Swiss-Prot record:
Domain CoA carboxyltransferase N-terminal per the UniProt entry, residue ranges: 26-286
Zn finger (C4-type) start-end: 30-52
A single GO cellular-component term on record: acetate CoA-transferase complex
Name recorded for this polypeptide: Acetyl-coenzyme A carboxylase carboxyl transferase subunit beta
Length: 286
């Protein structure tokens, strides 16, 4: 074997090895159009597919970072943490599910609340973390929402909620159902005072959250293509034994049938909500 033949195979093996080393998380596939997207570019586009305009799910903290001005932020109710009061267990202990979700997301529970500014206007904003137990509402979510709404009430500044949830948290039973009444009550206090509450539904919004805080806004908004309803389409079809209309429970269907007030593209959310809230509060947006 010549010296050249000895070198060529090693070069070939090295090149093959290098070409297979693609960093994890660098690419993401759009679930709607199957386009393979470069993650850094996708993030610059606010996680909206540039090919088909599909709005992908984003984390609660990312959502608030996109929405609020970068300065003068204060996270609220960080002392409220989940407790397994019922010692619930199905195929897995609830406390183990909580630990796993906290490890995966880096969050204590499924809702983050912040006081901040939107184009210079003071606001309180809350966002659901769907990656944490499906964004389900238990004691912590209900309590954080209520405390955030109370801050908005006391300071008479708008409250904006970004929902992404499967509904009430099964593992907390009646405690989770109680949050529906608690959050609805504090929203009623906002309405009585005339403090604006804007509900923004992102994909998906179901169950006890849709039956309480998500559809009680002075303005109910949805992102394009977002699904919202009490029960999912498959459950409804099985119950009524009929085929549902195309696009049932999607934002466009809900707007057409008067269930929501408007659909706002993620890239326009800051500008349009700032304009709305400026009219509500008679404050000028910067």
């Amino acid at each position: 074997m010549s010296w050249l033949e000895k070198i060529i195979p090693s070069i070939s093996r090295t090149e093959t090895k290098r070409s297979n080393k693609v960093p994890e998380g660098l690419w993401e596939k759009c679930v709607k159009c199957d386009a393979v997207l470069y993650k850094p570019e996708l993030e610059k586009n606010l996680d909206v597919c540039p090919k088909c305009d599909h709005h992908m799910r984003i984390g609660a903290r990312s959502r608030l970072n996109i929405f609020l001005d970068p300065q003068n932020r204060q996270e609220l109710a960080t002392d409220v943490e989940p407790v397994d009061r019922l010692k619930f267990k199905d195929i897995k202990k609830y406390k183990d599910r909580l630990s796993s979700a906290q490890k995966d997301t880096g969050e204590k529970d499924a809702l983050i609340a912040m006081r901040g500014e939107l184009k210079g206007m003071p606001v309180v904003a809350v966002a659901f973390e769907f990656a944490f137990h499906g964004g389900s509402m238990g004691y912590v979510v209900g309590e954080r929402f209520t405390r955030a709404a109370t801050v908005a009430l006391n300071e008479n500044i708008p409250l904006v909620c970004f929902s992404a949830t499967g509904g009430a948290r099964m593992q907390e039973a009646l405690i989770s159902l109680m949050q529906m009444a608690k959050t609805s009550a504090v929203i009623e206090r906002l309405k009585m005072q005339g403090t604006p509450y804007v509900s923004v539904m992102t994909d998906p919004v179901y169950g006890g959250v849709s039956a309480s805080l998500a559809l009680l806004g002075d303005i109910n908004v949805a992102e394009p293509g977002a699904r919202a309803g009490f029960a999912g389409p498959s459950i409804i079809e099985q119950t009524i034994r009929q085929k549902l209309p195309k696009g049932f429970q999607r934002a466009e269907f809900l707007l057409e049938h008067g269930a929501i007030d408007m659909i706002i593209h993620r890239g326009e959310m800051r500008d349009k909500l700032a304009s709305l809230l400026a009219k509500f509060t008679r404050r000028a947006a910067v």
